[in-house]
Amino acid sequence: MMEKPEGLKLIDENGRRIDGRKKYELRPIKMEVGVLKNANGSAYIEWGKNKIIAAVYGPRELHPKHLQRPDRAILRVRYNMAPFSVEERKKPGPDRRSIEISKVIKGALEPALILEMFPRTAIDVFIEVLQADAGTRVAGITAASLALADAGIPMRDLVAACAAGKIEGEIVLDLNKEEDNYGEADVPVAIMPLKNDITLLQMDGYLTKDEFIEAVKLAIKGAKAVYQKQREALKEKYLKIAQEVEGSE
């Protein structure tokens, strides 16, 4: 969180935010599944100005063998921001933030995967941020979950994610870049809606106990809306495949 420039209003007296949204409104979200031919599974997501692609490879035999688990597959996640994803060119390669977010995303996805079905193997998830505009970790989790489903990895449920936060003393849904930079708090949440499980819960900033509870409830509500969009994106892909099969008969 940065110090807010003098005169900048993140929310006006009518409850409208800097990008015109209401307090509890998501940014526009577009999802597409199966965008990469050479990956076992893939997904592309546009979330506000974020543009993120996720690819899944595996399960495949893990080398070197001493890293193998005899009872389950190992999930490996790499989150990376392209050098051109932000206004000031980012130095290529992993940095501390990317390594930390990779671990966070792995922790959010792992409870959904039935890894016991693939002992001695690895499942690799690559998340590439092409354009960043706040909320890349929740968008990355959402895209990666879709890519895992597209790869046919057995899952207990999809993982959907969303963040809530606090700006100008108000709890709002889905912070954009200015709100993330100059707001007071950010609460990213990931859930498995069918199981009613939370797989990620973080907080950056300061909230009272009541504000925290309100933010978590709002983020869960947002994640459930994201979950419906995930389901629609998967249905769209498999309807297209069904139509192609029918057309070739």
Swiss-Prot record:
Summarize the subunit comment: Component of the archaeal exosome complex. Forms a hexameric ring-like arrangement composed of 3 Rrp41-Rrp42 heterodimers. The hexameric ring associates with a trimer of Rrp4 and/or Csl4 subunits.
Its protein name is Exosome complex component Rrp41
Q: What does this protein do?
A: Catalytic component of the exosome, which is a complex involved in RNA degradation. Has 3'->5' exoribonuclease activity. Can also synthesize heteromeric RNA-tails.
Listed under GO cellular component are: cytoplasmic exosome (RNase complex)
Give the molecular function GO annotations: 3'-5'-RNA exonuclease activity; RNA binding
Task: Tell me its family.
Answer: Belongs to the RNase PH family. Rrp41 subfamily.
Q: What is its main location?
A: cytoplasm
Gene it is expressed from: rrp41
> Can you cite a GO biological process for this protein?
gene expression
Q: What subcellular locations does the record give?
A: Cytoplasm
Tagged with keyword Transmembrane helix = no
Cite the CDD domains for this sequence.
Answer: RNase_PH_archRRP41
Endpoints of the signal sequence: none
InterPro entries xref list:
ExoRNase_PH_dom1 (IPR001247), ExoRNase_PH_dom2 (IPR015847), ExoRNase_PH_dom2_sf (IPR036345), PNPase/RNase_PH_dom_sf (IPR027408), Ribosomal_Su5_D2-typ_SF (IPR020568), RNase_PH (IPR050080), Rrp41 (IPR011807)
